[in-house]
Amino acid sequence: MAEQDLYKVLGVEKDASQDEIKKAYRKLSKKYHPDLNHEPGAEEKFKAVNEAYETLGDAQKRAQYDQFGSTGGQQGFGGAGGFGGQDFGGFGGGGGFEDIFSSFFGGGAGGSRRSNPTAPQQGRDLQYEMTLKFEDAIFGKKTTITYNREEQCETCGGSGAKPGTSPVTCSKCHGAGYIQVQTNTPLGRMMSQQVCDVCHGTGKEIKDKCATCGGSGHTEQSHSIKVTVPAGVEEGQQMRLQNQGEAGTNGGPYGDLFIIFRVEPSKDFERDGATIYFKLPIDFVQAALGDEVQVKTVHGDVKLKIPAGTQTGTTFRLRGKGAPRLRGNGNGDERVTVNIETPTHLNKGQKEALKTFAKASGKSVAGNGKSSLFDKLRGV
């Protein structure tokens, strides 16, 4: 059966933020929860919603899904390109081949990890997009960011149970966290493991839920941290901040926060890596006779000597006037490309001077007063 579009399962767009995905998940999981919805098909929809959030709610798993169009476990069998240069532990953080075979045969190498649902589990990773001014990406900056993340509920200490009570062993999976399901496949009937839909893999049921967190063990809180943006970052680059993601379960560590940098364009410069590009307009007199001009750089104005006879498109290199190299080794260069501007409005004296120049050069002048010499001057 074709794999479902996980974004459609949660009813969100593909460019939805992590907060939008989380809100959609909460809404749908509550709507289809077997304890609240006894309509036919509600349990299957509840499972689908949980499976979709398992992938889209995790920054790394979501990126992998967006790239390959399938969940991590299936990509391992996607041909020579399915591994993408990643190690075998890169299938979305939930294990690699062991979990794949375990899902088919109900045990295997991955069974040892699944046999202990109360083991500490790391929290989800989060993404944060930071927009930088062009100059801030060049020189770096220190700033404070604020975002929402799931933190351990202070009321129940993360257990999800009402204070004074404790979770009990799950009545459906008997504490295993997973149930065995018989599935018809092209290879015949096979047993597979699925997360228990009652305890959601914890092996425990909460009879009296915490009023603060509703039994989840976590609450959404606003979290602020100081961030040092390194000098030389570029559009689309990421920086990982360990343990700044969401809280883990069963005493597990926090996930990580991945900051994705977005850089605003500059009105003066363009950039490619550590190299800065600048277009310098000069007039044809400067190009023909030469000149010394002031040139903008991200480090301040510098003088540049324009040799006589410079042509449009000539590029000069200013060493060390580019962006810092992110991993050290100084700055890149600035490339200055000359653009010769031809005057469009001339007074009588200027026209006569150009006609005299044209005559001395043996060039023809158009009868309407506009010299064909102008076209040649564009390339002086």
Curated annotation (Swiss-Prot):
Annotated coiled-coil segments of the chain = none
- One Pfam annotation reads DnaJ_CXXCXGXG
Alphabetic keyword roster: Chaperone, Cytoplasm, DNA replication, Metal-binding, Repeat, Stress response, Zinc, Zinc-finger
ZnF start-end (CR-type): 140-222
CDD domains from the UniProt entry: DnaJ (cd06257), DnaJ_C (cd10747), DnaJ_zf (cd10719)
Q: According to its UniProt record, where is this protein located?
A: Cytoplasm
Q: Which InterPro entries does the record associate with it?
A: DnaJ (IPR012724), DnaJ_C (IPR002939), DnaJ_domain (IPR001623), DnaJ_domain_CS (IPR018253), HSP40/DnaJ_pept-bd (IPR008971), HSP_DnaJ_Cys-rich_dom (IPR001305), HSP_DnaJ_Cys-rich_dom_sf (IPR036410), J_dom_sf (IPR036869)
Query: Its Gene Ontology biological processes?
Result: chaperone cofactor-dependent protein refolding; DNA replication; protein refolding; response to heat
Tell me the residue numbers annotated for binding Zn(2+) 2: 170, 173, 196, 199
Q: How is the cofactor bound?
A: Binds 2 Zn(2+) ions per monomer.
Chief location of this protein? cytoplasm
Q: Where does Zn(2+) 1 bind?
A: 153, 156, 210, 213
Gene Ontology molecular function: any one: zinc ion binding
**CXXCXGXG motif repeat ranges, renumbered to this chain:** 153-160, 170-177, 196-203, 210-217
The domain section of the record reads: The J domain is necessary and sufficient to stimulate DnaK ATPase activity. Zinc center 1 plays an important role in the autonomous, DnaK-independent chaperone activity of DnaJ. Zinc center 2 is essential for interaction with DnaK and for DnaJ activity.
Q: What does this protein do?
A: Participates actively in the response to hyperosmotic and heat shock by preventing the aggregation of stress-denatured proteins and by disaggregating proteins, also in an autonomous, DnaK-independent fashion. Unfolded proteins bind initially to DnaJ; upon interaction with the DnaJ-bound protein, DnaK hydrolyzes its bound ATP, resulting in the formation of a stable complex. GrpE releases ADP from DnaK; ATP binding to DnaK triggers the release of the substrate protein, thus completing the reaction cycle.
How this chain assembles, per its entry, is:
Homodimer.
Similarity remark: Belongs to the DnaJ family.
Its name, as the record gives it, is: Chaperone protein DnaJ
- What is the species listed in this Swiss-Prot or TrEMBL entry? Lactiplantibacillus plantarum (strain ATCC BAA-793 / NCIMB 8826 / WCFS1) (Lactobacillus plantarum)
Lineage of source species: Bacteria, Bacillati, Bacillota, Bacilli, Lactobacillales
